[in-house]
Design a protein with these regions (language model features):
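Conserved helicase motor core of SF1/SF2 NTP-dependent helicases
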Residues: 1-142
């Protein structure tokens, strides 16, 4: 938006709707930019129980910059819509966040058996465990 060209972003907003993913990791000023630019609907997606904005300056953090707009809205009583079904993690991995942060209500949208890809013949070390560490020593290209 070049003010020299006579464009007023509040009269002609570049976007009517804006969705900010991981908004709990963004600072308040970052999340306010779309509103200042005139967007009509702002959707904040995130989890205020997870990592917030990373602020390196202690003075700025103490002044409130370490709190996201999402968290501030939750603290003043705006009720967020909670994730109910997750598709990202293996069901065994989702057990911890479900019990620790979601009172055991987080459901899995994909079962363990549905996560197996057809045609992938990687020999998984322990099929009942969703994690492994693979260490490759040498043989890399330099």
């Amino acid at each position: 938006m070049n003010p020299q060209k006579g464009v007023n972003p509040t009269q002609n907003p570049p976007f009517r709707q804006v969705l900010i993913d991981e908004s709990t990791q963004a600072t308040e000023p970052e999340c306010l930019i779309p509103l200042v630019m005139g967007c009509k609907q702002l959707v904040l997606v995130g989890d205020h129980c997870q990592l917030g904005p990373v602020i390196m300056c202690k003075k700025a953090a103490k002044a409130g910059l370490a709190q996201s707009l999402f968290e501030r809205l939750v603290l003043v009583g705006v009720k967020p819509i909670r994730l109910q079904v997750q598709y990202r993690m293996h069901p065994c991995l989702s057990e911890f966040p479900s019990s620790a942060f979601y009172e055991g209500t987080l459901q899995n949208g994909v079962t363990q058996s549905e996560r197996v890809q057809a045609g992938v013949d990687f020999p998984w070390p322990v099929p009942t465990r969703p994690m492994m560490f693979y260490v490759q020593v040498g043989g890399g290209r330099g």
